[in-house]
């Protein structure tokens, strides 16, 4: 079938398999051009491996370090009449290219919050890999069913303590609008922490330790975003921030648990990028459009693969990791440079419907957004017939 983009709000409801494959190939080419990651990982588990930063972490491990990788995700395949999710096509493409290189690559499709998926993962590691030396935790989910109680929690994106008004960008209508977000209730904050905080990461590491499938010196990292003051009210100081602060607490216990193995656990701070998760945050499209404009002018613009490749080389496996006073690994330093943030702030209030394309890089934002779903990827002929029914060989279905 011929597949065209159909965007509804902050999601594109169609995806393009050939575009997703080309997108994955571009990321692989970027990593390979950088050469090997010195002393990089060899057997890697990526929890949340199908899109965005998790996919970039899997690509960097495999193609920067020659690592065998096991990926966990929750995606939907295509059929003859309907495309699957982008993460499905990304993972199929990743495995295809990894197998061509002679690398082990397998995937588990199911709910990573569940005990069943943890059990299947451990069985697969024992059978195929023995032990893993890196565990990347990169889940972004709107809800979580607690594996012990069955309780269902939903995450909320709201400020804490007070309602907040700010400028936003309606990406459908392409207009600047004022948005008001009401303050989260205590319950909403607690539920958001239950979904996006560190409990599940801790459960994963506990399960892997108990099963004795973590190698000596094993590392684990979970990804976070801090941002600067423009986004603080609704992000770092809001309900999502409460969950991210929970990661900062939980990592201390995880680090202690890994100490007997000579291992380490770190939260890694990455820059703001276009992902399916970030496009749902009301102020992010405007912030990202301005950030892209400023960072491209300065020659420092980066996407997921540049960020994660740099994180591996500089910090996770670098001789002098970039650590902050909280012990987090930092890859977001270019975004937070004072000259970048002050310029974004200066332009923030000047943007109007009339000068949107002039003052911001909304065009670049839109293009990167469509790239997520396999559209507007260089070198892909979108008039060609494609088969949306793409298989992932040896997929383990939970």
Curated annotation (Swiss-Prot):
PANTHER family linked: ENOYL-[ACYL-CARRIER-PROTEIN] REDUCTASE [NADH]
Function (record text): Involved in the final reduction of the elongation cycle of fatty acid synthesis (FAS II). Catalyzes the reduction of a carbon-carbon double bond in an enoyl moiety that is covalently linked to an acyl carrier protein (ACP).
Keyword annotations of the record: Fatty acid biosynthesis, Fatty acid metabolism, Lipid biosynthesis, Lipid metabolism, NAD, Oxidoreductase
Family: Belongs to the TER reductase family.
Pfam families: Eno-Rase_FAD_bd, Eno-Rase_NADH_b, Enoyl_reductase
Signal peptide: none
Catalytic reaction equation(s): a 2,3-saturated acyl-[ACP] + NAD(+) = a (2E)-enoyl-[ACP] + NADH + H(+)
GO biological process, one term: fatty acid biosynthetic process
Major enzyme class: oxidoreductase
Residue positions binding substrate: 225
Gene from which the chain derives: fabV
Keyword field contains NAD: yes
Residues given in the record as NAD(+) binding sites: 48-53, 74-75, 111-112, 139-140, 244, 273-275
Gene Ontology MF annotations: enoyl-[acyl-carrier-protein] reductase (NADH) activity; NAD binding; trans-2-enoyl-CoA reductase (NADH) activity
Site feature location: Plays an important role in discriminating NADH against NADPH: 75
Active site (UniProt): 235
This protein's pathway: Lipid metabolism; fatty acid biosynthesis
Keyword Transmembrane helix: no
EC number(s) stated in the UniProt entry for this protein: 1.3.1.9
Protein name per the record: Enoyl-[acyl-carrier-protein] reductase [NADH]
